[in-house]
Amino acid sequence: MKQEYALVNGALSSGVSGTGASMAGLTGVITTLATSRNSGTSLSETEFQDMHQHSWEKGGTDNAFDLVLVPFNLKRKIDGFTAGATKYVDQSDKKLTQPVAIYETSAGVARIMQHRYVPGTNASVATAASSANAFLGIKEDLYKVAYLRKPFKEMLAKDGDRENGQIVGEFTLEYRGERTSVYRQGYAVNG
């Protein structure tokens, strides 16, 4: 879980003066299309489409973001987008499906996923990097986890009947498409 949190929220540190080096996560490396919204701004379908267009303009025709990571509150807001569609529901099914998993704009197709470590009001106190909801849009194949040392289990001294061990490894976030990515924060609690 610490690795997953660091990939999203890590803060860059060079490791001088006796502190350990740390990497910048997605919220730290996305700078070209990073903005803070006015307090209480609500995420709209038009704004979503505008962000996708800006990503397409900065990254080129094949490089608009294709994965959106948002906290649960914003995912619920996106679930309410209609994209001008009419929904037909079989009445005998007695089931209404609302979640939006894929959204298509003129800039391309994007998968929408709620993520527990994207800054938002629904994050736990221990993991909240911000008190405002954030939106991350990335081109998935332009980001990779690069291992400096592949994780491995290292056994430690035996303690009674218990065998102790630890997982050791080093990694960093490799990013090749920062210009195509979007990071917006400051959305209202209800999206």
Please describe what each predicted stretch is.
Residues 1-22:
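Short, glycine/acidic-rich hinge or "gate" loops at secondary-structure transitions
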Residues 18-50, 77-191:
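Sequence/fold signature of self-assembling virion shell proteins
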Residues 49-61:
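Short, basic/hydrophobic alpha-helical segments
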Residues 64-67:
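Conserved active-site beta-strand-loop modules that form the wall/rim of enzyme catalytic pockets
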